[in-house]
């Protein structure tokens, strides 16, 4: 009977080739960078919305040709006005006031002057123009009025004042009318909700696309594996391989094609090693198709695509391999077979050392109780890792990774609300996977040098060529 205590997903072990020492001492620092990225993403996502583009609906007649102003007008508001804030209200901010830009130049508004929010500079400019009845030289260029250039074209600046609704008849001595304040609150809430809804929709869309690509491209996933290991599958249970006799039986039925062409005449350890490589090559192909479906990946420079896959496939494979493992063994041959952990440990050295570290990692990884939607985002984050050596467009790839890590974090919060430390635990698992790949590659290096019959598959050799 197959024990089913742990979670499962697809794939089988992977063999490595030419490699010296995969991970550098800089790795922990690199993982720190990932954590900083995720923290900054979290801060951005939970921060308040800075309202910078609000405009009132209002008009005031301008003029054609030279501008002749209305007759006198009293002074406007005090230089600075702070609006009282009700705790919990929409305009509550660290400064205790609504943070609004000047309607004319975009500088920070000091208050509600002449019927609109304006800065001290534009308030004073409008007041002087009105009081002194200034006439400015006509300008037909419709100059854009900004903080840095607002003094260059007084004609266009005054027209901007009028167009946004400034009027000497609308003086409120810096206080915002109650109706305007209510209107502003409603506008801010609407904008915030619209932006939140839009961002949430984008994040959900990204998560959905990655999850669908995961289900589409991998032959085995955790749900399928759990059903098989629990004995709930409608078809026949997996054939258990626990000794040399059952191994030979499985080779004649489950993996007959893999042990053809002379492989069947080699010793059992070499045959198992060969089957592991064949499964790994198939998984590399699946991972390549999955990566192409990650939004933005296919648009990367081809060299960067190759580099990301070259450095990421083994980490991704060992993460997904956990899903077909439990404490007693692992599924093989598309779930049709189950090879026991004890049998793998009984193989002669160095082959007996290949799978045991993967079981140790899998038990800890499976304890996180991730589902396929979690794993799909985790694998995508592994592939789109901006610290891989030799990348050409590092900035763009880091931005991709930030987006995926952000989605992963939010998805975990939603999918596992009771485990607030799950996200940092997964970041640590990224570090553990790099170490696992390092140790695996070193072991395969030993096998390559000492076992003449255990040849490496050409694709796997290419993956490890000049990797570190």
From Swiss-Prot:
Give the record's PTM text. Answer: Ubiquitinated by E3 ubiquitin-protein ligase HUWE1; leading to proteasomal degradation. Phosphorylated.
Keyword Aminoacyl-tRNA synthetase belongs to the record = no
Annotated tissue distribution: Skeletal muscle, liver, heart and kidney. Expressed in monocytes.
The UniProt entry, under InterPro entries, shows: 1Cnucl_rcpt (IPR003074), NHR-like_dom_sf (IPR035500), Nucl_hrmn_rcpt_lig-bd (IPR000536), Nuclear_hormone_rcpt_NR1 (IPR050234), Nuclear_hrmn_rcpt (IPR001723), PPAR-alpha (IPR003076), Znf_hrmn_rcpt (IPR001628), Znf_NHR/GATA (IPR013088)
**Pfam families, A to Z:** Hormone_recep (PF00104), zf-C4 (PF00105)
Give, as residue ranges, the zinc fingers classified NR C4-type.
102-122, 139-161
Which residues does UniProt assign to DNA binding? 99-173
List localization entries: Nucleus
Site positions for Essential for heterodimerization with RXRA: 433
Which Gene Ontology MF annotations are present?
DNA binding; DNA-binding transcription activator activity; DNA-binding transcription activator activity, RNA polymerase II-specific; DNA-binding transcription factor activity; DNA-binding transcription factor activity, RNA polymerase II-specific; DNA-binding transcription repressor activity, RNA polymerase II-specific; lipid binding; MDM2/MDM4 family protein binding
Read off the SUPFAM superfamilies from this record.
Glucocorticoid receptor-like (DNA-binding domain), Nuclear receptor ligand-binding domain
Binding-site positions, indeglitazar:
280, 314, 464
Q: What does the annotation give as the result of altering residue 391 to R?
A: Abolishes heterodimerization with RXRA. No DNA binding
**CDD domains, alphabetized:** NR_DBD_Ppar (cd06965), NR_LBD_PPAR (cd06932)
User: In the UniProt annotation, what is the result of changing residue 370 to R?
Assistant: Abolishes heterodimerization with RXRA. No DNA binding
Family to which the UniProt record says this protein belongs: Belongs to the nuclear hormone receptor family. NR1 subfamily.
Assembly and binders = Heterodimer; with RXRA. This heterodimerization is required for DNA binding and transactivation activity. Interacts with NCOA3 coactivator. Interacts with CITED2; the interaction stimulates its transcriptional activity. Also interacts with PPARBP in vitro. Interacts with AKAP13, LPIN1, PRDM16 and coactivator NCOA6. Interacts with ASXL1 and ASXL2. Interacts with PER2. Interacts with SIRT1; the interaction seems to be modulated by NAD(+) levels. Interacts with CRY1 and CRY2.
Provide the protein name.
Peroxisome proliferator-activated receptor alpha
